[in-house]
């Protein structure tokens, strides 16, 4: 059984009935329920298609936050070989919210950075729900500097509601760490590819997403602030998050139209959590194509194209 979102209740009810009938048929050794099960499966598939054909931005935000979506470490495990993680910022501590290291992608050495939310209570606490502290972004800068030194393409996976806003993080220079990570992205003379795999929230996201190629999963979101935060600021009412989500144009489709991202990676019907391997493999295909397209571009051109890309985003919005 999946973890169903509120708007998926019609599908949840039907799939619950299907499971009950299958269990009953197995217990009784009966094949007579096959027609009824097939009928319910068709109704369930049709209901899911109908729901996902007309998703609102707020519903997409909920899918982007789905606890069962594939997370950064799952992408790393499936797409890369010989992954060697690096720990610590050489100043204060190691931040488990931000994963970073080196590995091979289709045999090519690459640098990898990504935000990890965790998949259960224990790992979510370990990874701080994907909200990195200053030491996480300083670790990212370490990886970026080494990627540039050794001329390794950089691949980043973005999945965060935002950088950690706690007092301790502010005391250790959260704003400076985010700004430096963002600036370092702009200096790199290697190909940089960024994938928004779930939430792309605020400076916590952009700090590792200033890339030559930026892609989003079909039901991911990317914005300067969460819908709830925007609603609280604009209307002093966080319950209007649904309105804020629509007004801010946070979806992959909106951002592609605005030329902020370079492409959209399709998800299985029902979201990435219903077909993790297929969506991770599709992401790998996009990364491979992007690396091929930048293979013969010199470092200075890559750097200037990246800077120009983000300057144009600022001018055009």
From Swiss-Prot:
Sorted UniProt keywords: ATP-binding, Cytoplasm, Fatty acid biosynthesis, Fatty acid metabolism, Lipid biosynthesis, Lipid metabolism, Nucleotide-binding, Transferase
Asked if the Swiss-Prot or TrEMBL record annotates the protein with the keyword Acyltransferase, the reply is no
Q: Report any Pfam family annotated for this entry.
A: ACCA
Location in the cell = Cytoplasm
Q: Which SUPFAM superfamilies match?
A: ClpP/crotonase (SSF52096)
Q: Spell out the GO cellular component terms annotated for this protein, sorted alphabetically and separated by semicolons.
A: acetyl-CoA carboxylase complex
Pathway this chain belongs to? Lipid metabolism; malonyl-CoA biosynthesis; malonyl-CoA from acetyl-CoA: step 1/1
Q: Which GO terms describe its biological process?
A: fatty acid biosynthetic process; malonyl-CoA biosynthetic process
UniProt function note: Component of the acetyl coenzyme A carboxylase (ACC) complex. First, biotin carboxylase catalyzes the carboxylation of biotin on its carrier protein (BCCP) and then the CO(2) group is transferred by the carboxyltransferase to acetyl-CoA to form malonyl-CoA.
Q: Mind telling me which PANTHER family this protein's record contains?
A: ACETYL-COENZYME A CARBOXYLASE CARBOXYL TRANSFERASE SUBUNIT ALPHA (PTHR42853), ACETYL-COENZYME A CARBOXYLASE CARBOXYL TRANSFERASE SUBUNIT ALPHA, CHLOROPLASTIC (PTHR42853:SF3)
Subunit-level organization: Acetyl-CoA carboxylase is a heterohexamer composed of biotin carboxyl carrier protein (AccB), biotin carboxylase (AccC) and two subunits each of ACCase subunit alpha (AccA) and ACCase subunit beta (AccD).
- Protein name per Swiss-Prot or TrEMBL: Acetyl-coenzyme A carboxylase carboxyl transferase subunit alpha
Gene name tied to this protein: accA
């Amino acid at each position: 059984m999946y973890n169903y979102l509120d708007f998926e209740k019609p599908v949840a009810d039907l799939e619950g009935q299907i499971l009950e009938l299958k269990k009953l048929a197995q217990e009784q050794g009966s094949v007579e329920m096959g027609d009824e099960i097939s009928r319910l499966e068709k109704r369930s598939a049709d209901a899911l298609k109908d729901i996902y054909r007309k998703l609102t931005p707020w519903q997409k935000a909920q899918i982007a936050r789905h606890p069962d979506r594939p997370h950064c470490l799952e992408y790393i495990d499936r797409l890369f070989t010989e992954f060697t993680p690096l720990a610590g910022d050489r100043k204060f501590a190691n931040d488990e919210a931000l994963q970073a290291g080196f590995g091979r992608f289709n045999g090519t050495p690459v640098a990898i950075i990504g935000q990890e939310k965790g998949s259960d209570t224990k790992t979510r606490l370990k990874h701080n729900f994907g909200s990195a502290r200053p030491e996480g972004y300083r670790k990212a800068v370490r990886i970026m500097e080494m990627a540039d030194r050794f001329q390794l393409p950089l691949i980043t996976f973005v999945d965060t509601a935002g950088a950690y806003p706690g007092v301790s993080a502010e005391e250790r220079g959260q704003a400076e760490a985010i700004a430096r990570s963002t600036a370092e992205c702009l200096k790199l003379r290697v190909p940089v590819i960024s994938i928004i795999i779930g939430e792309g929230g605020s400076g916590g996201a952009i700090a590792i997403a200033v890339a030559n190629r930026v892609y989003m999963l079909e039901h991911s979101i990317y914005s300067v602030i969460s819908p709830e935060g925007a609603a609280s600021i604009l209307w002093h009412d966080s319950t209007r998050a649904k309105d804020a989500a629509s007004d801010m144009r946070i979806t992959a489709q909106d951002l592609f139209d605005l030329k902020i991202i370079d492409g959209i990676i399709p998800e299985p019907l029902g979201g990435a959590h219903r077909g993790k391997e297929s969506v991770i493999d599709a992401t790998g295909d996009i990364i491979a194509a992007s690396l091929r397209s930048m293979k013969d571009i010199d470092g200075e051109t890559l750097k200037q194209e990246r800077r120009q890309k983000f300057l144009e985003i600022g001018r055009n919005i």
